Amino acid sequence: MFYDDLSVYPAFGGVVFAQEEGQRIADYLGPKNKNLIMQNHGLLTAGGTVAEAAAFFIALERACQTQILVESSTAPGSIGASEGNLKKTFVDDEVALYTKKGTGTPEAMYMQFEPEYQLILKETGGDFLN
């Protein structure tokens, strides 16, 4: 889903009040990326629609949470501590591209977000629309 579509912004300068900070963030996204991890701050996602951006955000946040859980469960001193530390496993480029084409499209992102939207609409009675 995030293959060749994710950047890391290492120097987040706080709330974007100045045009320069906004430009730096845009530069890190580049011409094609829709997802940005801002170190020591959080996530930023974009999309052609609100649904696409929201679905990317939800998926990226869940991926980050999973990564943190794995790393904390294998850290020294934890029950699942690994002797050789946690080793990265990279997905083959061909597999990653195939996965992105099936899960990272605007249509797929809409289909992933729509159930979340319907749940929020039901739980709030639509109050957020006012």
Regions found by a protein language model. Give the residues of each.
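A conserved C-terminal secondary-structure "cap"
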Residues: 33-130
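Short HxH-centered metal-ligating active-site micro-motif
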Residues: 19-34, 41
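Class I SAM-dependent methyltransferase SAM-binding "motif I" and its flanking Rossmann-like core
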Residues: 1-17, 21
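Alpha-helix initiation and capping sites
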Residues: 15-19, 23, 47, 54
